[in-house]
């Protein structure tokens, strides 16, 4: 039985060692499954894979019905932000480190992908975040994020003071090294390192996690993603904001960063029988050494 996905885009972590040969092998495998393969244009130009058609993100959105990402979670997040508006499902083959969302082991990709291409998979939809920076009433920066929005102090010593509001209601002023607003997907990333909780992907919420707060009672809090969170820069030098891998290097006093749920979702496809808890056990090394 041939693939249910006729047109497949291949996106790679092209800086990784051996990426060209890995991508070429996967492309040829997809061809044997009845798929027409196109290579994302940056991947093609950086690996020299010119024997296949090349497409930019808009072209993938218009012509492909599946995107196969070979790399780590960062590679997946980068292309996923561009493709979310088109509703293209994403499958991840891990060539990074942890691989929470690029969950197919490279050495197993053929055996794992064959049934998935026939339609045997678990679909996992996750809401994105839409953020903007408002200065003197004018938007000076906007971005979408899948993992988190982070406001933090600059390279100089000293904390930042941040005023936090939810739906226009004052929550608190926080003096800290920064503040993380993380989605359930991002709760396994920087937010986890800063002491935040894990949020199951099905939870329609976010977690606010202070980074090294001066007041020890400033603890992480879980909020609904149906509202809008605003963080205002009250004090501190050289503060910056990061939206996944996108940055605004300099924030000024009075700048307001607002975060709300995006209208777009990322669609991840996992092997049949996939479990979020299996992923946590494996990636976070739970129960290792337990008989």
From Swiss-Prot:
Superkingdom field: Bacteria
Swiss-Prot/TrEMBL catalytic activity: NAD(+) + ATP = ADP + NADP(+) + H(+)
Enzyme Commission numbers on file: 2.7.1.23
Pfam families listed in its UniProt record: NAD_kinase, NAD_kinase_C
Subcellular location field: Cytoplasm
GO molecular function term, any single one: ATP binding
GO CC annotation terms, alphabetical: cytoplasm
Keywords linked to the UniProt accession: ATP-binding, Cytoplasm, Kinase, NAD, NADP, Nucleotide-binding, Transferase
Main location: cytoplasm
Annotated SUPFAM superfamilies: NAD kinase/diacylglycerol kinase-like
Cofactor(s) the record lists: a divalent metal cation
Gene Ontology BP annotations: NAD metabolic process; NADP biosynthetic process
Catalytic residues of the enzyme: 73
Family: Belongs to the NAD kinase family.
Role summary: Involved in the regulation of the intracellular balance of NAD and NADP, and is a key enzyme in the biosynthesis of NADP. Catalyzes specifically the phosphorylation on 2'-hydroxyl of the adenosine moiety of NAD to yield NADP.
Name of the protein this chain belongs to: NAD kinase
Organism: Polaromonas sp. (strain JS666 / ATCC BAA-500)
Name of encoding gene: nadK
